[in-house]
From Swiss-Prot:
EC number assigned by the record: 2.8.1.10
Domain of life according to the entry: Bacteria
Name of the protein in its database record: Thiazole synthase
Cell cycle among keywords: no
Annotated catalytic residues: K96 (schiff-base intermediate with dxp)
Record gene name: thiG
UniProt keyword terms in alphabetical order: Cytoplasm, Schiff base, Thiamine biosynthesis, Transferase
Function: Catalyzes the rearrangement of 1-deoxy-D-xylulose 5-phosphate (DXP) to produce the thiazole phosphate moiety of thiamine. Sulfur is provided by the thiocarboxylate moiety of the carrier protein ThiS. In vitro, sulfur can be provided by H(2)S.
UniProt key word Transmembrane helix: no
Pathway connected to this protein: Cofactor biosynthesis; thiamine diphosphate biosynthesis
Leading EC class: transferase
The family this protein is said to belong to: Belongs to the ThiG family.
Catalytic reaction annotation: [ThiS sulfur-carrier protein]-C-terminal-Gly-aminoethanethioate + 2-iminoacetate + 1-deoxy-D-xylulose 5-phosphate = [ThiS sulfur-carrier protein]-C-terminal Gly-Gly + 2-[(2R,5Z)-2-carboxy-4-methylthiazol-5(2H)-ylidene]ethyl phosphate + 2 H2O + H(+)
Gene Ontology CC: cytoplasm
Length: 256
């Protein structure tokens, strides 16, 4: 069976979801259910063990794999510190590295991300680094023992789609590591396109959370990701510059 494998762990769903920007946390369980997702990311600052109502973990089903992120880190040192706190709080070994010092476009700092990835991978973390699409940075993250790489499709929260499509395509073609397209995906059709290209998974948050009906949108993304993966495995037909008839154009009337 076709499974997503991250750090030796197998997952049936190739859709990862987030926890931010929802009007109410109460909708999260239903969103997660309809998405079919098995991995959910969250900022560590949203975990409040002393306040059940404010603790995001209260709303996440126990069977989900938690992917804490280092949101708020502006350099490798801060990201490493957040990851270690996450482990001490019982959030497990998965960690999504986010190192962002740019406050306007929120673009990840690849150099600091590589540094943090190496340190945390050496400590036994299953590291999924969020990155600006770049082949050379991707290779260095592999050398740093990342479990996957997470190139952005467009600036985070923008819903602009796959603006970095060609750079992501190069990474898919050249890197022997799971590629999870993260950030910028605004429509199910864009998630499907990423999967048709050969991405191993996508992470979607804003597009679901900001939808008129987040629950229905979660299901739409589930179906899109599944359809895109099926199309990639089936291998789409060749693109032709000219028309090609699907039925013979000659000989029929002459035989009557």
């Amino acid at each position: 069976m076709d499974k997503l494998v991250l750090g030796g762990h197998e997952f049936n769903s190739r859709l990862l979801v987030g926890t931010g920007k929802y009007g109410s946390n109460n909708i999260l369980p239903e969103v997660i259910k309809e998405s079919g997702s098995e991995i959910i990311t969250m900022a560590l600052r949203r975990v409040d063990l002393d306040n059940k109502q404010e603790n995001i973990l209260t709303y996440i089903p126990k069977e989900m794999t938690i992917l804490p992120n280092t949101s708020g880190a502006t350099n490798a040192e801060e990201a490493v510190r957040i990851a270690r706190i996450s482990r001490k709080m019982g959030c497990g070994d998965f960690i999504k590295i986010e190192v962002i010092s740019d406050t306007r476009y929120l673009l990840p700092d690849n150099e600091e991300t590589i540094k943090a990835t190496k340190i945390l991978a050496d400590e036994g973390f299953i590291v999924l680094p969020y990155m600006t699409p770049d082949l050379y940075a991707g290779r260095r993250l592999i050398e740093a023992n990342a479990a996957a790489v997470m190139p952005l499709g467009a600036p985070i929260g923008s819903n602009r789609g796959l603006q970095m499509k060609e750079m992501i395509r190069i990474m898919i073609d050249e890197l022997d590591i799971p590629i999870i397209v993260d950030a910028g995906i605004g429509k199910p059709s864009q998630a499907m396109e990423a999967m048709e290209m050969g991405a191993d998974a996508v992470l979607v948050n804003t597009a679901i959370a900001s939808a008129g009906d987040p629950v229905q949108m979660a299901r739409a993304f589930k179906l899109a990701v599944e359809g895109g993966r099926e199309a990639y495995i089936a291998k789409t037909g060749n693109v032709s510059e000219f028309a090609n008839a699907s039925s013979p154009l000659t000989g029929f009337l002459g035989n009557l």
